[in-house]
Amino acid sequence: MEKEKLTNRTSTHKFNETDRETNHSRRHRHHHSRHRESKHGRHDRSERPSSREAGDRSRHERFSKEPLEVKKLPVENEYFDSKFASASSMPSSKDNPQNNDFTNSLQGLDFGTFGSRIQREPIDRKSNKPGEIFVGATLQNESSTSTEHKDIEQLETEINESGINYKIGDNGSRWRMMKLKRVFDMAQDQRRPVEEVALERYGSLKEFDFALEERDELELRKRTRKVQKEVPTGELYEKRCADEFKTRKDSGNGATYYKVIPDPSVNKDTPTESDLNRLKADLLRAQLKKDPNYESLEREYQKACDDFENSLHPSENSNSQATIPSKKRNFDDPTIDEMVQEEKLLNKQRKYGQNYEYAKQIAKDKTYSNNLDYLDENAGKLSNRMKRGDVSLAQISSGGDLKKINHVLDTCPLCLNYETQPLAPVISLSHRAYVSLPTQPELAKYHCLIVPTGHRINTLSCDEDEWDEIRNFMKCIALMFDSMNLGVIFYENAPSPQRYMHTAIECIPVSKRILSLAPAYFREALSTSDEEWSQHRKIIDTLEGSKKYGKWAFRKMMVKELGYFHVWFSIDGGYGHVVEDEKAWGRHDQVPRQVFASMLNLPPEVIRRKGSWTGKKDPREDMFRSRFEKFDWTKGLID
C-alpha cells in the first residue's frame, strides 16, 4: 500500500511538473506571439489557431494517444469563430434523429449576421402626400392633382434651399423687423399693395413671408416666454401659395366638386401653378425696373395663362383668356373704402379749412367791417389764426387726429398769441420767440428755456426768422453765464413728432470744467440709449459739421420728420441723435436729465420732472430778469 501511494505521489508530482512546464512554454509562446504581432502586424492572426484551441490540443495529446484532427471551417465572422465550436465537434443528425427538425430549420441562415444592429429602412418624407384635391365637374383629367403635387415638392425644395443663415431673435432681428415695418409704412403712404412693395424691397415674397413669420414668433415669445422655433419654417409662404391656388381654382365656373378622373390625354407641356407664379414675378420685376422686355414677358405670361386655363377647361374655347385675379390696385377705378376715405378728408378740409377759420373769426368780431382799413388793422390776428388752421390741415393730410390736435393746441402751456398768454413765465419776448423758466425741480440755478411763440414740434420746423431770433437768445444767455464764469449747455428733446408737443431749448449753466467733460458724458449716454442694431448713426456730430456748414450745421444735418435729441456745446453745434424707439428713450427728458444728474451729482428725484406751470408769478423771475437785463437783445426792438 505504501509503495502504491508513493508511486501515485511520484506520478502526480511528475504530472504537475509537466503541467507547469507546459503552461510556462505556453506563456513563453504567447509572449513571443504578441511580440511578433506587434512587430509584424495582425494581418495573419486569423491563419493561426487561437490559444484556447492550442490548450485543448495539448490536453488531448496528453490524455489520448491518437491525435485529434481539428478542421477549421471558413466562418465569415471572427466573433463566432472564437466563441463557437467548429462544425465537426457537433453531433450529426444521424446520431441524434431528434435534432433533424432543428437542423433543417437552420439551413440557409447566415449566423454571421446574428447580434448585429437592425438597419432601419429610410423614411421617405415626400410620401406624406396631401389630401385629395377636388376640382370642378368639367375637369376630366389629373393635371391639377399632378400640378399641386409638383408645386408642393418644388415649394419644399425652395424652402429647404432658401439658405437661412440667421436665427429668430439674434442681433440682426431688430434690423429685419424695422425693414418689415418700413414695408408696411411705405405701402400705406404710397397707397400700394403690401405684396408689391415687399417684392420691391425683398426681391421675393418668400423672404417677406420669412420676415412675417419671424415677427409672429417674436410676438409669441413676448406673450408666452416660450421658444416655438429657432428659424423660419416657410409655413406662411406655403399657405400663401395654397391660398393663391385655391383662389384661382375657385374663380372658375363654380360647378359642383368631385374627385379628379385621370385622363391619359394630358399634355405634359401644360404650364403649372409654379410656372405661372414665376412668370408673374418676372413680369412684376420688369415693370418695376422698366425693362424693355416687359411686353414680351407680358405676352408670354398671357399665353401661359391661356394654356393653363385651357388645360383646366378643355371643352371651352382655347383662345379665351384666363380669369386670374390680380392684386394690383387700379387708381382709376377706386374701391368703396378709398372713396369713403377721400370724402372724409374733403369734408374735414371744407369744415376746418381756411374759409371756415376766416368766417369764424369774423363772427366773433363785433367791429368787423368789409373794408381794407379793417384788414390792415387786424392783419396780425387774422394771420395768427390762419397759421393755426394751416397746421391743422397739415396734420389732417398726414393722417393725424384733428380733435386731438385741437385739444393739444388749446391746452398748450407755451403757446403765445393774441388770444391766450402762456402759463409759463415770460422773461424776455421778441417777435417769434421768448425766454422762460422751467418747471420744478430745475437742474441748476438760472436754468432757463428758449421757446418759439408759435406751436412748433421742433426747432427744425421753424423758419429762418424764427431760428435767427432763437440763436440771438442763445448768444445772450451764453454771454450772461460767461460773465458769471460759467459755461452753458443747450439741448432740445423732441422724440415724438406725432404727439405734437410744443418744443423748447433748455439752457443749463455748468462750470467750465464740466463743460469740457460734457461731450464724453453725452457720447456714452447716446451710444447706449438705443439697441445695438439701429438704422441711423448713434451720434451725428454737428460740431464737426459746423466747420463746413457754419451756423446751419444743425439744420442741414438733422431731419425734422424724425424724432431726435440734440445737445449744443457751443452756439454752432454739438451731438445729435435720432430717436428710433420712443418707449426706450422715455418721456420728460429722462435721458438728458440722467446725464446732468451724473455730471452735477444731483439727487434721484431731480431726474423725473413732476412739476407744471400754474400761470402764477414765479419767485425766480425777478432774480433771473435782473441778471439777464443787461444782455437782453430785445431792448433794441423796443427802442
From Swiss-Prot:
Family: Belongs to the CWF19 family.
Biased composition (Basic residues): 25-43
Record carries keyword Nucleus: yes
Compartments where located: Nucleus
Region described as Disordered: 1-75, 86-105, 309-332
InterPro entries: Cwf19-like, Cwf19-like_C_dom-1, Cwf19-like_C_dom-2, HIT-like_sf
Subunit structure: Belongs to the 40S cdc5-associated complex (or cwf complex), a spliceosome sub-complex reminiscent of a late-stage spliceosome composed of the U2, U5 and U6 snRNAs and at least brr2, cdc5, cwf2/prp3, cwf3/syf1, cwf4/syf3, cwf5/ecm2, spp42/cwf6, cwf7/spf27, cwf8, cwf9, cwf10, cwf11, cwf12, prp45/cwf13, cwf14, cwf15, cwf16, cwf17, cwf18, cwf19, cwf20, cwf21, cwf22, cwf23, cwf24, cwf25, cwf26, cyp7/cwf27, cwf28, cwf29/ist3, lea1, msl1, prp5/cwf1, prp10, prp12/sap130, prp17, prp22, sap61, sap62, sap114, sap145, slu7, smb1, smd1, smd3, smf1, smg1 and syf2.
Any GO BP: mRNA splicing, via spliceosome
Species name: Schizosaccharomyces pombe (strain 972 / ATCC 24843) (Fission yeast)
A Gene Ontology term for the protein's cellular component: post-mRNA release spliceosomal complex
The protein, known as: Pre-mRNA-splicing factor cwf19
SUPFAM superfamilies in the cross-refs: HIT-like (SSF54197)
Intrachain S-S bonds: none
Assigned keywords, A-Z: mRNA processing, mRNA splicing, Nucleus, Spliceosome
Pfam families in UniProt: CwfJ_C_1, CwfJ_C_2
Bias kind Polar residues: ranges: 95-105, 312-324
Keyword Membrane tagged: no
Compositionally biased residues, Basic and acidic residues: 14-24, 44-75
Role of this protein: Involved in mRNA splicing where it associates with cdc5 and the other cwf proteins as part of the spliceosome. Involved in mRNA splicing.
